[in-house]
Each structure stands twice: as structure tokens, then as C-alpha cells.
């Protein structure tokens, strides 16, 4: 399986061009129009890149995010170089079952060793249509993560869930979307399965104020570690300077010889060579 090539500079896409792509997808006429899968992969950005708002026009990210939420679903697709870096670090095999529970256009899937073992859920019908076009052998459903119930369990769950959406749970408690993503992953992972998830740097950052959420995670996972991501990691999607981190968790096993590792708020700085595509976004 050969992944699609990522161009050095992904071009901005206009709403008009997006509408044309979606019409071609609906009519299955992309090939006739000369639009290749690589064209779609390198130019489709989703709601997060089409909101028409500029981060620089707002005093802080929270103000920018509040305005953006009125137009979209907090949707910023994970940049392909970052997806490739995460997948490479996990050293997946072609027999591993891998899920992205809010897969967007499926950028993580482009770097998996076996597309047939990829599973995804995406609430936005347009992004889901793009993902299905690019990865026809993957198992991709259109729907809400809260309703996603695949008939299998996974070796790995990867993800960049929406940030700071607040969802009311059946028991009337309120939970952030990224915390819910982690708990849903725990339900769907095999014992000792790995969760690699991008979250805001503020998630579980304070051992006192976040102790309830930390206990909730520790009841399901053994903590493996976390690293800060470059602040410009999502600049291609219109957000620059918003701190995020990458966390790794391993689902607990009932085996007596498996002592879970407790969570630590320590967060390492990831080393990325200056020539790596993830760093190129700052240029």
C-alpha cells in the first residue's frame, strides 16, 4: 500500500472549489473531471480551513474559537506530516486494527500499513465523503462518535478529536469532547491496546484541579507519556500559537504482572529536525 504524496506547500482552497469537489464526489465524476485523489488529499481542508476568520484578528485563541464554533464544528484536520510522524513512532504492522474515532478526511489512514484494517467515524458528511473516496478499503461510517459501536476491538486508536466542545452525558454530567474521546477509546481498545491522542496542552495539566479526570483516565489506562507539539503544528488549518500535546496511553490488562503506570503532568518537548515537514509550517 503506497500512501498519497504530500506536497511541500498545501494550497489554500476556496469554498467554491470545495463545492465543486463535493459535487464531483456525489456524482462519482472526479476522474472524468481530471481531479485525482492526490488533488483532493492536498487541497481539501474541511470546515477548519474554510471559516474565513483569521486568528490574528482576535485577542486570544478562546475568542477566535468562540467565533469559529458559530460556523463549524471545531474541525481542524491533522496535518499529514504530523500524522506520518505519529504513525511512524507507533511502528504499526499490517495486521494491527487501527481506528480514528473522529477521522475527518482520514489523514491518519494515508500512512497506515494496511488500509483494510483502518476504521473511522466522522460526523461531517462532506469530510466523510472525502475519506471514503480516498480510502475505499477502509471501514468508514458517517455518524457521531457517541453513537459509534463497531463490532470489533482495536490494537490502536489514533486521534485529534474536537477541542473544548462540552457534551452532556446520559447521567447528566458534562464532559469535554477530547475527554470523551479518550474514554470511548478505552471501551474500544483491546487489553494493552494503545491510544495516541492530540489534546490541548491544558488537558490534565494540573494534578489538583484535574484530579477527578486523572483518576478517570487511570482507572482505564496505564500512562505511557506525553510530548508538547510545535505551536505552529496546525498553522496550515488557520490556527497558529495554540498549545497542544500528544499523549500516549495503554489500556489496562487484568494480568497480575501488569502494574499500571500512574499519570504525570510532566510533558517533554518533542525533538523534530529543522528540515522535517512538521517544522516547515512555521515558515
Where are these regions (language model features)?
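Switch/connector loops and helix/strand junctions flanking conserved nucleotide-binding motifs
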Residues: 164-167, 205-207, 236-238, 256-258
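Class I S-adenosyl-L-methionine
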Residues: 1-134
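Conserved beta-strand segments of alpha/beta enzyme cores
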Residues: 117, 138-139, 222-225
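Conserved phosphate-coordination/catalytic loops
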Residues: 76-81, 172-179
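Conserved Class I SAM-dependent methyltransferase catalytic core
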Residues: 121, 125, 174-235, 242, ...
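Conserved proline-anchored active-site loop of SAM-dependent methyltransferases
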Residues: 84-92, 97-114, 120, 124, ...
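Glycine-rich phosphate-binding "P-loop"
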Residues: 70-71, 170-172
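Flexible, glycine-/basic-rich loop-and-beta segments that form/coincide
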Residues: 235-283
Amino acid at each position: 500500500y503506497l500512501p498519497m504524496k504530500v506536497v511541500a506547500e498545501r494550497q489554500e482552497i476556496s469554498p467554491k472549489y470545495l463545492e465543486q469537489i463535493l459535487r464531483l464526489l456525489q456524482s462519482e465524476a472526479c476522474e472524468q473531471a481530471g481531479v485525482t485523489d492526490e488533488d483532493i488529499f492536498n487541497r481539501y481542508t474541511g470546515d477548519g480551513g474554510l471559516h474565513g476568520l483569521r486568528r490574528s484578528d482576535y485577542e486570544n485563541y478562546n475568542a477566535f474559537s468562540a467565533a469559529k464554533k458559530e460556523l463549524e464544528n471545531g474541525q481542524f484536520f491533522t496535518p499529514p506530516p504530523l500524522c506520518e510522524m505519529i504513525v511512524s513512532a507507533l511502528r504499526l504492522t499490517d495486521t494491527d486494527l487501527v481506528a480514528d474515532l473522529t477521522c475527518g478526511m482520514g489523514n491518519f489512514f494515508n500512512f497506515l500499513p494496511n488500509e483494510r484494517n483502518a476504521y473511522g467515524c466522522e460526523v461531517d458528511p462532506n469530510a466523510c465523503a472525502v475519506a471514503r473516496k480516498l480510502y475505499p478499503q477502509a471501514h468508514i461510517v458517517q455518524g457521531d462518535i457517541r453513537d459509534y459501536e463497531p463490532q470489533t476491538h482495536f490494537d490502536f486508536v489514533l486521534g485529534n478529536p474536537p477541542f473544548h466542545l462540552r457534551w452532556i452525558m446520559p447521567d447528566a454530567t458534562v464532559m469535554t469532547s477530547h475527554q470523551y474521546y479518550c474514554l470511548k477509546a478505552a471501551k474500544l481498545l483491546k487489553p494493552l491496546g494503545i491510544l495516541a491522542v492530540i489534546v490541548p496542552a491544558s488537558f490534565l495539566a494540573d494534578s489538583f484541579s484535574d484530579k477527578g479526570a486523572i483518576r478517570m483516565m487511570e482507572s482505564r489506562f496505564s500512562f505511557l507519556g506525553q510530548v508538547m507539539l510545535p505551536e505552529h503544528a496546525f498553522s496550515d488549518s488557520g490556527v497558529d500559537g495554540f498549545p497542544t500535546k500528544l499523549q500516549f496511553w495503554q489500556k489496562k490488562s487484568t494480568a497480575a504482572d501488569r502494574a499500571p503506570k500512574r499519570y504525570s503532568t510532566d510533558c517533554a518537548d518533542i525533538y523534530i529536525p529543522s528540515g522535517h515537514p512538521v517544522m516547515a509550517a512555521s515558515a
